[in-house]
Amino acid sequence: MLIAIDIGNTNIKLAICANNKIIKRITISSQSRRTADEYFIYLNSTMNQLNLDYKNINNIIISSVVPSITKPIIELSQNYFNIDPTILSNHHADIFNIKISLQNKVLGSDRLADIIAASSLYPHKDLLIIGMGTATVFNLLNKDKCIYGQAIAPGAHILAKSMRQYTALLPEVLISKQDKVIHDNIYHAMESGIYWGYITMINGMIEKIIKEEEKDLYIIATGGNSNLFFNHKTAIHNIEVDLTIKGLIQLHTVLS
Protein backbone atom coordinates (compact mmCIF):
# COMPACT_ATOMS: atom_id res chain seq x y z
CA MET A 1 0.00 0.00 0.00
CA LEU A 2 0.98 3.60 -0.59
CA ILE A 3 0.56 6.71 1.50
CA ALA A 4 0.49 9.82 -0.70
CA ILE A 5 0.96 13.02 1.28
CA ASP A 6 0.26 16.56 0.07
CA ILE A 7 1.64 19.09 2.57
CA GLY A 8 0.05 22.47 1.90
CA ASN A 9 0.06 25.80 3.70
CA THR A 10 -3.42 25.27 5.11
CA ASN A 11 -3.87 21.49 5.27
CA ILE A 12 -1.94 18.25 5.09
CA LYS A 13 -3.79 15.71 2.97
CA LEU A 14 -2.90 12.06 3.39
CA ALA A 15 -4.32 9.41 1.08
CA ILE A 16 -4.08 5.72 1.89
CA CYS A 17 -3.96 3.95 -1.46
CA ALA A 18 -4.16 0.36 -2.64
CA ASN A 19 -3.84 -0.81 -6.25
CA ASN A 20 -3.39 2.84 -7.27
CA LYS A 21 -6.81 3.77 -5.86
CA ILE A 22 -7.55 6.07 -2.94
CA ILE A 23 -9.25 4.11 -0.17
CA LYS A 24 -9.14 6.75 2.57
CA ARG A 25 -8.49 10.49 2.72
CA ILE A 26 -7.24 12.18 5.89
CA THR A 27 -6.97 15.95 6.33
CA ILE A 28 -4.93 17.53 9.12
CA SER A 29 -4.46 21.26 9.68
CA SER A 30 -1.00 22.52 8.78
CA GLN A 31 -1.31 25.17 11.47
CA SER A 32 -1.11 22.64 14.32
CA ARG A 33 2.48 21.45 14.11
CA ARG A 34 2.96 17.87 15.27
CA THR A 35 5.83 15.49 15.93
CA ALA A 36 6.40 12.28 13.96
CA ASP A 37 4.95 10.35 16.90
CA GLU A 38 1.76 12.42 16.89
CA TYR A 39 1.31 11.97 13.13
CA PHE A 40 1.73 8.22 13.54
CA ILE A 41 -0.86 8.00 16.33
CA TYR A 42 -3.36 9.88 14.16
CA LEU A 43 -2.62 7.81 11.05
CA ASN A 44 -2.53 4.44 12.82
CA SER A 45 -5.85 5.15 14.56
CA THR A 46 -7.47 5.81 11.19
CA MET A 47 -5.97 2.66 9.69
CA ASN A 48 -7.19 0.57 12.63
CA GLN A 49 -10.72 1.84 12.01
CA LEU A 50 -10.40 0.56 8.44
CA ASN A 51 -8.94 -2.78 9.60
CA LEU A 52 -5.69 -1.92 7.85
CA ASP A 53 -2.27 -2.82 9.20
CA TYR A 54 0.28 -0.02 8.94
CA LYS A 55 2.95 -2.68 8.36
CA ASN A 56 1.47 -3.21 4.88
CA ILE A 57 2.56 0.28 3.81
CA ASN A 58 5.48 -0.17 1.43
CA ASN A 59 5.87 3.29 -0.08
CA ILE A 60 5.37 6.91 0.92
CA ILE A 61 5.47 9.79 -1.56
CA ILE A 62 5.39 13.41 -0.45
CA SER A 63 4.62 16.73 -2.08
CA SER A 64 5.40 19.64 0.21
CA VAL A 65 5.42 23.42 0.10
CA VAL A 66 6.07 23.67 3.87
CA PRO A 67 9.65 22.55 4.65
CA SER A 68 9.14 22.73 8.43
CA ILE A 69 6.44 20.04 8.19
CA THR A 70 8.38 17.89 5.73
CA LYS A 71 10.95 17.00 8.40
CA PRO A 72 8.57 15.26 10.90
CA ILE A 73 6.79 13.52 8.00
CA ILE A 74 10.13 12.10 6.84
CA GLU A 75 10.79 11.00 10.43
CA LEU A 76 7.35 9.36 10.50
CA SER A 77 8.22 7.43 7.33
CA GLN A 78 11.62 6.31 8.55
CA ASN A 79 10.84 5.60 12.21
CA TYR A 80 7.52 3.79 11.88
CA PHE A 81 7.45 2.42 8.32
CA ASN A 82 11.18 1.93 7.75
CA ILE A 83 10.76 3.78 4.46
CA ASP A 84 12.84 6.57 2.95
CA PRO A 85 10.02 8.53 1.33
CA THR A 86 10.14 9.93 -2.18
CA ILE A 87 9.97 13.73 -2.12
CA LEU A 88 8.49 15.05 -5.37
CA SER A 89 10.73 17.67 -6.98
CA ASN A 90 11.24 19.26 -10.36
CA HIS A 91 13.69 16.59 -11.54
CA HIS A 92 10.79 14.11 -11.59
CA ALA A 93 9.25 16.11 -14.45
CA ASP A 94 11.67 14.44 -16.87
CA ILE A 95 10.19 11.02 -16.06
CA PHE A 96 6.87 12.18 -17.51
CA ASN A 97 8.38 14.20 -20.38
CA ILE A 98 7.05 17.38 -18.79
CA LYS A 99 8.92 20.53 -19.74
CA ILE A 100 9.05 23.49 -17.36
CA SER A 101 9.44 26.67 -19.38
CA LEU A 102 9.34 29.10 -16.47
CA GLN A 103 12.00 31.52 -15.25
CA ASN A 104 14.51 29.67 -13.03
CA LYS A 105 12.46 26.49 -13.64
CA VAL A 106 10.69 27.16 -10.32
CA LEU A 107 7.48 25.20 -9.80
CA GLY A 108 5.88 24.14 -6.51
CA SER A 109 5.78 20.37 -6.02
CA ASP A 110 2.00 20.46 -5.56
CA ARG A 111 1.64 22.15 -8.92
CA LEU A 112 3.98 19.61 -10.52
CA ALA A 113 1.86 16.78 -9.11
CA ASP A 114 -1.22 18.47 -10.58
CA ILE A 115 0.45 18.71 -13.98
CA ILE A 116 1.59 15.08 -13.91
CA ALA A 117 -1.99 13.97 -13.28
CA ALA A 118 -3.65 16.47 -15.63
CA SER A 119 -1.40 15.61 -18.58
CA SER A 120 -2.41 11.97 -18.18
CA LEU A 121 -6.13 12.55 -17.58
CA TYR A 122 -6.47 15.10 -20.40
CA PRO A 123 -3.86 14.19 -23.03
CA HIS A 124 -3.39 16.26 -26.19
CA LYS A 125 -5.26 19.25 -24.74
CA ASP A 126 -4.18 22.79 -24.01
CA LEU A 127 -5.00 23.10 -20.32
CA LEU A 128 -5.59 25.85 -17.81
CA ILE A 129 -5.22 24.25 -14.38
CA ILE A 130 -6.53 26.34 -11.49
CA GLY A 131 -5.33 25.38 -8.03
CA MET A 132 -7.78 26.75 -5.47
CA GLY A 133 -5.82 26.43 -2.27
CA THR A 134 -4.29 28.92 0.13
CA ALA A 135 -3.26 30.79 -3.00
CA THR A 136 -5.10 30.59 -6.31
CA VAL A 137 -2.66 29.47 -9.00
CA PHE A 138 -3.42 29.52 -12.74
CA ASN A 139 -1.06 27.21 -14.67
CA LEU A 140 -0.91 26.90 -18.44
CA LEU A 141 0.05 23.50 -19.82
CA ASN A 142 0.10 22.98 -23.57
CA LYS A 143 -0.68 19.77 -25.44
CA ASP A 144 3.05 19.06 -25.70
CA LYS A 145 3.21 18.83 -21.88
CA CYS A 146 5.09 22.08 -21.47
CA ILE A 147 4.13 24.36 -18.58
CA TYR A 148 4.91 27.82 -19.85
CA GLY A 149 2.98 30.40 -17.85
CA GLN A 150 1.20 31.11 -14.60
CA ALA A 151 -0.60 33.71 -12.54
CA ILE A 152 -1.02 33.71 -8.76
CA ALA A 153 -3.77 35.39 -6.73
CA PRO A 154 -5.02 35.18 -3.13
CA GLY A 155 -7.12 32.19 -2.17
CA ALA A 156 -10.66 32.57 -0.85
CA HIS A 157 -9.60 31.83 2.74
CA ILE A 158 -6.91 34.51 2.58
CA LEU A 159 -9.58 37.01 1.54
CA ALA A 160 -11.77 36.00 4.47
CA LYS A 161 -8.96 36.10 7.03
CA SER A 162 -7.53 39.40 5.78
CA MET A 163 -10.81 41.24 6.35
CA ARG A 164 -10.84 40.07 9.94
CA GLN A 165 -7.14 40.69 10.47
CA TYR A 166 -6.97 44.20 9.03
CA THR A 167 -10.21 45.65 10.39
CA ALA A 168 -11.25 46.45 13.94
CA LEU A 169 -14.89 45.41 13.84
CA LEU A 170 -15.47 42.97 11.00
CA PRO A 171 -15.89 39.34 12.12
CA GLU A 172 -14.27 36.27 10.62
CA VAL A 173 -16.76 34.37 8.47
CA LEU A 174 -16.92 30.99 6.79
CA ILE A 175 -16.94 30.69 3.03
CA SER A 176 -20.19 29.24 1.76
CA LYS A 177 -22.28 29.21 -1.40
CA GLN A 178 -24.47 32.29 -1.79
CA ASP A 179 -27.58 32.51 -3.94
CA LYS A 180 -27.72 36.31 -3.95
CA VAL A 181 -25.25 39.15 -3.78
CA ILE A 182 -26.88 41.79 -1.56
CA HIS A 183 -27.81 41.04 2.06
CA ASP A 184 -29.13 43.00 5.04
CA ASN A 185 -26.69 41.74 7.71
CA ILE A 186 -22.94 41.99 7.98
CA TYR A 187 -22.20 38.25 8.16
CA HIS A 188 -24.05 37.36 4.97
CA ALA A 189 -22.79 40.52 3.29
CA MET A 190 -19.19 39.49 3.95
CA GLU A 191 -19.83 35.89 2.88
CA SER A 192 -21.42 37.15 -0.32
CA GLY A 193 -18.61 39.59 -1.04
CA ILE A 194 -15.98 36.89 -0.62
CA TYR A 195 -17.92 34.23 -2.53
CA TRP A 196 -19.08 36.31 -5.49
CA GLY A 197 -15.91 38.39 -5.50
CA TYR A 198 -13.84 35.22 -5.80
CA ILE A 199 -16.02 33.85 -8.60
CA THR A 200 -15.76 37.17 -10.43
CA MET A 201 -11.97 37.07 -10.08
CA ILE A 202 -11.84 33.49 -11.40
CA ASN A 203 -14.04 34.28 -14.39
CA GLY A 204 -12.21 37.53 -15.10
CA MET A 205 -8.83 35.80 -15.02
CA ILE A 206 -10.06 32.98 -17.26
CA GLU A 207 -11.43 35.49 -19.77
CA LYS A 208 -8.20 37.48 -19.85
CA ILE A 209 -6.00 34.38 -20.11
CA ILE A 210 -8.02 32.98 -23.03
CA LYS A 211 -7.92 36.36 -24.78
CA GLU A 212 -4.18 36.65 -24.24
CA GLU A 213 -3.48 33.08 -25.37
CA GLU A 214 -5.79 33.31 -28.40
CA LYS A 215 -6.71 29.63 -28.26
CA ASP A 216 -9.24 27.31 -26.69
CA LEU A 217 -8.29 26.00 -23.28
CA TYR A 218 -9.79 23.12 -21.34
CA ILE A 219 -10.15 24.45 -17.81
CA ILE A 220 -9.93 22.26 -14.73
CA ALA A 221 -9.86 23.23 -11.08
CA THR A 222 -8.43 21.46 -8.08
CA GLY A 223 -7.79 22.17 -4.43
CA GLY A 224 -9.82 22.52 -1.28
CA ASN A 225 -12.15 25.20 -2.61
CA SER A 226 -12.82 23.78 -6.08
CA ASN A 227 -16.01 21.94 -5.11
CA LEU A 228 -17.43 25.11 -3.60
CA PHE A 229 -17.09 27.20 -6.74
CA PHE A 230 -17.59 24.67 -9.53
CA ASN A 231 -20.78 24.87 -11.62
CA HIS A 232 -21.88 28.10 -10.02
CA LYS A 233 -21.49 30.61 -12.79
CA THR A 234 -17.84 29.82 -13.47
CA ALA A 235 -16.21 29.01 -16.79
CA ILE A 236 -14.52 25.89 -15.37
CA HIS A 237 -15.13 22.71 -17.36
CA ASN A 238 -14.33 20.12 -14.69
CA ILE A 239 -12.97 19.66 -11.19
CA GLU A 240 -10.40 17.16 -9.99
CA VAL A 241 -10.35 17.51 -6.21
CA ASP A 242 -7.70 14.79 -5.82
CA LEU A 243 -5.49 15.95 -8.69
CA THR A 244 -2.37 16.41 -6.54
CA ILE A 245 -2.78 13.00 -4.91
CA LYS A 246 -3.39 11.41 -8.32
CA GLY A 247 -0.10 12.88 -9.52
CA LEU A 248 1.70 11.33 -6.56
CA ILE A 249 0.05 7.97 -7.28
CA GLN A 250 1.30 8.16 -10.87
CA LEU A 251 4.82 8.83 -9.64
CA HIS A 252 4.53 5.79 -7.38
CA THR A 253 3.41 3.68 -10.34
CA VAL A 254 6.34 4.76 -12.50
CA LEU A 255 8.93 4.28 -9.76
CA SER A 256 7.62 0.91 -8.56
UniProtKB/Swiss-Prot annotation:
EC number: 2.7.1.33
Binding residue positions for ATP: 6-13, 134
Cofactor(s) the protein requires to work: NH4(+); K(+)
Gene Ontology BP, a term: coenzyme A biosynthetic process
Name under which the protein is recorded: Type III pantothenate kinase
Top-level taxonomy: Bacteria, Pseudomonadati, Pseudomonadota, Alphaproteobacteria, Rickettsiales
Cofactor note: A monovalent cation. Ammonium or potassium.
UniProt keywords, alphabetically: ATP-binding, Coenzyme A biosynthesis, Cytoplasm, Kinase, Nucleotide-binding, Potassium, Transferase
UniProt binding sites for substrate: 108-111
Family assignment from sequence similarity: Belongs to the type III pantothenate kinase family.
Cellular component, GO annotation: cytoplasm
GO molecular function: ATP binding; pantothenate kinase activity
Active-site residues, Swiss-Prot/TrEMBL: 110
